[in-house]
Amino acid sequence: MEDITICIATPDEIPELVGSITKARAEMFPFLDQASSNRMAQKEHENFRKNHLDHPLGAFLTARSEGRLVATIGYVPYDGRFPFLNLEPDNVVEVVRLYVNPEWRRAGIASKLFAQLADKAQHAGVKQLYLHTHPFLPNAIGFWEQNGFSIMSVDKDPVWQTTHMSRLLKE
């Protein structure tokens, strides 16, 4: 594999990143209808800079090979939308948008991206990382467990079985 460069996303990359996120969402969740996908993409585009680039508890990293986007990961301030979770009261972020292009998988890129993201979060004063994933996403739960996350709760919904996970960061 060619050399990979991991960088903090910039405002001029937003259209490309939102396009990539939209494509990844269609691959991971093929059962979502096009209208829902379009609404999510529009919302993502409108809020990307505010949530990922301008917010002190936001970040977004890209991995590129020879200028080509091959993977992404980010975090945003946790919005409290799952009140049943027992998360820290302050400085909690939600890890989002980990995606590695299929031809680049199993090369350690996701682990490298996450390690840099966790380091950035720690330097930003983040106390806890939260994420949710689903068992139908190949290797997702195992990957996060290998990276220090613990399962907090699993929704009983038979389709999504949303798996809520968290990891405390060292002070």
Language-model features, listed with the residues they occupy:
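Conserved acetyl-CoA-binding loop-helix of GNAT-fold acetyltransferases
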Residues: 100, 106-119, 145-146
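Conserved GNAT-fold acetyl-CoA-binding loop/helix
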Residues: 5, 25-49
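A short, internal acetyl-CoA/4′-phosphopantetheine-binding micro-motif in the GNAT/acyltransferase core
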Residues: 90, 96-105
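Conserved N-terminal entry element of GNAT/NAT acetyltransferase domains
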Residues: 1-15, 171
